[in-house]
């Protein structure tokens, strides 16, 4: 299992391919009881999960997950797998293998959208019925080069394995994609082709276009484009699949020697051509017909002379004409583009379209029977002209060839008459033949285009053939398809189960071979063997008088009761008739044999074929150029030789099918197959749903459960010996001895023998141990128990060890403390002794003597080192000389090795050539054998035909004899008649005498004749009146058809407009969502990229630092000269070895080349020699590495002594290193030629070095990052603390934000309500459209009835004409008899009298006949009158229907208008909401800003209050004697209370004002400007107050001093105070008047600003009570500060406003300075304060007035909004009522439709009864029609009322939509912004995709290198152990050398 990081390469497809690491861990840790968790059989769901409750006497009680309790037998309970097997990727690995385990594993994976699962060697895929992101380019890249076990299950994995097998095994591959119809075979085929087209060109340049200009795309584009073209002409909708392939195809993709695409070809099988002329009710014909009529390319409609309505063409409209999941317009463009890409010429392209159109016109050809003959004649030539024009034929010739074909009889051509039925059958056969031959020609043309003539070596074939089909009506096509699937299933069984059992034999396991593949042999033999179904069918086709009944009887005689697979079908009521049933592997299929003989013979009109051959259209002439041999051609482009081989003019469809099937099976047997089994999860095409019975049936049919069967009999679980030993060694470690080598197989045998398990449940193979199902799970449980015990013991021992260690430390610490205490006590006792003091003085003097001794020894050592240095210098010079010679020898050795490598390459090339010639010879042998088989078949057929011709010749001889006899008889009769003529002439002469007697009789006859002529004239008058009525009816029908056509066009236009609007709306919504998602993703990716860039920059800096370090290391590496000196000696020794080995290798190479030439391609000796050479090279390399390591160890000691003298040899060391690296590289290249792995090892070693460097740099970075991290951590701590403070302060603002969001949610709910109403209106519109369609169908049916009546009338006219002809014939006979009697009267009077009597009788009979005809004409006249009345009634119904349709159209247009207006309103409301939110936020920020400024002013006023309080105290001391002072204080207190009350009211009103602010839209900007002005004014005035307070303080001090010094100043100040008091009282009165006026104006204004006014009044008038208000304001200040922290971002937007405020503040400061000079006395100060107060009050009163206006407007807006909401609610209710009414009307319409259908049936019956004289039924039907007309009129009245109500609603909706105009403008601005963002997002997305692609490729390279690195590390470990041994030896040798010296 891969980790989450490895799954990241799959991108967003990862969760759809494999469980995440967290899910896997959770599954393993989930509680599970293996003894009680089971699957139990259950009748409804087949199997359910449950837990065992009890077991009693073979019965088991189980409680299911649903809570039900079941009691079943033991064999109906199946154990459940442990949780770690949940959603397992390979079901063959499960512990318990049975049906429910497989079913639930597929179900759980399907529920998680993991649709691919392995089951042993093949892959199971379940159709998801939805798009999944598992086929994207990054997924293709992720699967490339991956082994099957390395990646999740996928069709790409199967494809890549086939590709890799082809490259490595040099064998052709095939991928068989099978399953039932609708299981997803075609989609998986397309994915396989997509994968090969992607990976086989990666890294290659696009192929250049051929100079001829035919190819419009690259080869991979053409391979992919072939699929849409084939799907358009070969796929159709069936009952089970909307895009079912109605032909089989085997696509071969050829690859060159390098694995790149070379070419491709396609073989097709069994195109279902009957679908061209016939479809079932729920199906439709091939897609191309509906693509053309989709009107996506109007020029096609004009060119093909067709309409856009498929119902105009019977061949393509017998079933459905549209498919919900297919867009025919888009598919037409894809088909057209594919034709261009595939290189079809423009002429060929036009021919394809024209032939397709001609097939459609063929269905409209009509023929009628000639009068008094069985000969057919054309019924109109318009359609024939169109068809002939499209095929470049003569219309008259075409019709003549169809009605009068020429047939060769003997040596002459005879014109043959055809009946209407025969001509219709011939037209259908021609249409099928043209379509089939065109399809096969297109396939051949595609193969011609895909054949690039490039060298190709192997191919991969992809088989996509129609799945098993069981329909209600199954014909010959279904038998062929099901037989093909039967053969493929047999091939699958043989391949899968034989391989499984061959592996047992290969591993040496005793096994009895079981032939599972023979299970299907009985059914296959029944169909294809001699005297089988196909054989009997072909035999019947040989006999001219054979019929379907004779064929059926032969089948019954031959097989019924004799073959178990052949049965008589059961008769089921309501189901199509069936003649026999076959038991296939997928179920029992009932077949109907009607028309099989004709289908099998497939005859064509040879005269028309001759016209085709002479056609001016080259393509058509080419299709039928080999008409006699065309029937023998193969069904695919690859089977071109089939027709030429057969060469006969008569080959049946079944024989051709069997021939192609045998070729397919031969192809498959010559390849290595890969199987993909597709599963249908449910019949309803519901994503995510799985029907248990259906899936189990398919699993049984597909062989999945058959594979489980062999797994249960065999050994499904298998593990390599080494893996088993490693994993399960813990079960009994003593069984495998430690410290000695033991083979993994023997270790596994010992281990299993020592475990208490059933030893018959496993077998030992050569490389693996095989287990029965379930045993591996038991071993897992035992291992878990053992691990639990071991871990418990380990924990106990660890804890004991730690406790003992801690105890030992405590003991050691205790002893050390005792020791230290003892020594200190002893020292304290002796430190005052005199001797001890002497010792302390002498001790330091002893060190100088020791240092002198050490200096002497160091000098001696220095001398020795100097001598050794001189010796080493001499040695170094010698080694340098040796190194030069060694370098020359190395170069020579290198040249020799290179020569050997060239010889080896030549040998390998010769070997490859021999292998190629062998393959070519084998291919030629296969071709020769195939030709021989074909020739044998041809001979057999020729002999059979010879016998048949001999029989025919004998029959012809008999016919000739009979004709000769009849000729003789005819001659005798001729002579007799001549004699009679002579006698008659003699009698004529005698008859002349009797003329006179007959004159009287002649007159009587003339009178009778005149009477008949009069009667005939009356009949002709009646006929004329009938023809006039007929013409009138035809005109009415034409008018109705024209009106119906207009209605259809209108309806189609409306539907297109509606679909376009809905599509645009959905696209807009989806695009917005996609843009938002992509924006978030891109933001995240940008952050990641920025982080990566910063990391890369830091890495670059580290690399620079590393470069400096490497320069230092270069100097250190110079010390390795001594190592290289030792290596020189080793190189000499290795050179001798290499020389010897080289000679041996060259000799062996010559022997190998001779053997190869003698053996003609035998490569086994070459492989063995390669292995030997590889081993010898490995030995050489190990010897060289050992010598190198040995010398490194020896040089380590010398490096310490000669470190100073090595600097000069640095350059030489570098040269030696380069030489060494070059030699190693050359060795690795030689090894790479022998074995490809050597190059990987070299790259891995380099990567390892780079990684080590990167590791060192990363360590340095890590240390730096740690320091940075600590600093960042400190900053983070500071920031977190600050954030905590900010969060506490932001609580209040978040609460207000929640309130605003609640309001937004309320508005969004309103928006959703509107959208729901819009959806409801859409639904009603769709229902109205459906009703309109139903009425259109009714009109069409009534037209059909009119046609039937017209045909009956024509038949009556024809019968009347026949009677007239009979009458005229009788008159002529009378005249003849009269003349005869006149001539013979004299001689034969008596005979004439008798003739006269006879003539009179005949005349009487004729008259009676005329009377009967007249009666019949009268009855027909009455019938015609009645039918005419009915037609007029129907016309009235049609007119009413048209009126209803017009009303519905009008209603639909009104609904469209309402829909558009509501859309516009919703968009404008949304924009209005966003604007109001934005403006509310800005207003809130401005409000909080003003509050902030105001609270700052309050802080400044605090000092003012304190100073004013002191001043008031002084003034109160001075004014104690004034009686008026108390009165004033009392009044001020009243005012204070009143102001406080107003304050409370203002606070309550503030909340209401904040709520109402949300509804203000247009006035907010003006308020903001005014608020800015107020703020600047307040700031200015606050600054003035600050300065005034300071000045007041100074003035008050001076005044107090002056008042104390002089009484005059006191009196003056007292008078001033009295004057001030009076003035303030007057000012106070004025202020009260202004205040009352302001209160009246601001009654409905913003209470927030009134609160501010109250606070200002309270501060200025009652300074002594300001402390309490100050505390309240402090609380408010705290709240505002918390809000301000949240709104800091918005404050930045208002900086411009703040700058303006700063400028006004500076002006105010200047004014404050001027005022401070004027304010010197208390009187002037108080006066200025009062003036300021007045100004503020006037400003505030103005603001309040304006706010009152704003609030009034807000209330008006609210009332309008409420009124609009109530209106919308009323409209919603009325719309709901209208919807109910529409639903009722819809139901009535459906009833009417059903009634109309019943009436049509009854009308047909009534017409038949009318012809027979059934007048009672006609009267009943007429009464019923009148009742229905009354009901239709009542329904029309209701519809009119509904339309009136809708018009009222439309007016209301228009009134509401006017309010959404501004929102629409905002949405346009937003749309522009979205477009810009979309452009940016696309650019970001493109960059991100490029980056992801690059990262994926790098990641793949990294994984590959990592894998190679692991292998190199293993080899390095082995080499390291050997190096250590050599180092030990080298140290010993070095010590010996030193000791000897």
From Swiss-Prot:
Residues 86-784 form the Myosin motor domain. The modification Phosphoserine is found at residues 392, 625, 1094, 1098, 1164, 1239, 1245, 1263, 1290, 1294, 1305, 1308, 1476, 1497, 1516, 1556, 1576, 1602, 1605, 1716, 1728, 1741. Its main location: cytoplasm. One of its GO terms (molecular function) is ATP binding. Residues 1130-1149 have a biased composition (Basic and acidic residues). Residues 661-683, 763-777 are annotated as: Actin-binding. Residues 787-816 form the IQ domain. Signal peptide: none annotated. The modification Phosphotyrosine is found at residues 389, 1494. The modification N6,N6,N6-trimethyllysine is found at residue 130. It comes from the Eukaryota. GO terms for biological process: muscle contraction; muscle filament sliding. The rodlike tail sequence is highly repetitive, showing cycles of a 28-residue repeat pattern composed of 4 heptapeptides, characteristic for alpha-helical coiled coils. Limited proteolysis of myosin heavy chain produces 1 light meromyosin (LMM) and 1 heavy meromyosin (HMM). HMM can be further cleaved into 2 globular subfragments (S1) and 1 rod-shaped subfragment (S2). Myosins are actin-based motor molecules with ATPase activity essential for muscle contraction. Belongs to the TRAFAC class myosin-kinesin ATPase superfamily. Myosin family. Muscle myosin is a hexameric protein that consists of 2 heavy chain subunits (MHC), 2 alkali light chain subunits (MLC) and 2 regulatory light chain subunits (MLC-2). Interacts with GCSAM. This is Myosin-2. It comes from Homo sapiens (Human).
